[in-house]
Amino acid sequence: ASAAQPDAVGAAEEENGLLDFLKKPKYIFLFIGDGMGTAQIQSARFYKGTTENNGAITEGELSFTSFPEVGSVTTYDSTSFCPDSASTATSIATGNKTESGVINMCPWTRDVPYETIAEKLHKQKNYKVGVVSTVNIDHATPAAFYAHQNTRKNYYQIGVELANSGFEYFAGGEFQKVNGDGTGPNNHEVAAQAGYNVVTTQAG
């Protein structure tokens, strides 16, 4: 009986671990270091460790490099080994590859949108969704979680999709073509009409 006890304990721990894994998370955070690959992370670790140890070559620890799990993914897109923010963010947001410059659209037909994980959580699970960026809020990386465009340069249309997304919160740099072609309401007005409280800084 005593010999079997470790197996029983191990099975119980495994079951408890599985149950913890299957629990619905209260919050989900996705952080994207745009253009940050293994080389950039390793350089930052060496810089941090060396500066903290008076110039002695030392590998430092970053807040996320001590996480218990790590993974890696391919970064090429459907047509290029050197992709851009639009296609790579599409892969992160939807699990699908597309062409460089395209946001959440099928690369073969250009008329089939890909649903993002943020949209799925918002519609199917009633999660509240926020998108926060240090770049323009209609830049390809943040836009990949709420927009669907055949070119990342459709900034005004991306801004309209932001307003139509129904997501609860957005924060980032100004819309890049806030007035569009000048024939319709600007992106601030479109967002306000959709119920958003639009707040800008002095810099706009």
What are these regions (language model features)?
Residues 6-181, 185-204:
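N-terminal catalytic scaffold of extracellular/periplasmic and nuclease hydrolases
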Residues 1-5:
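Sec-dependent, cleavable N-terminal signal peptides
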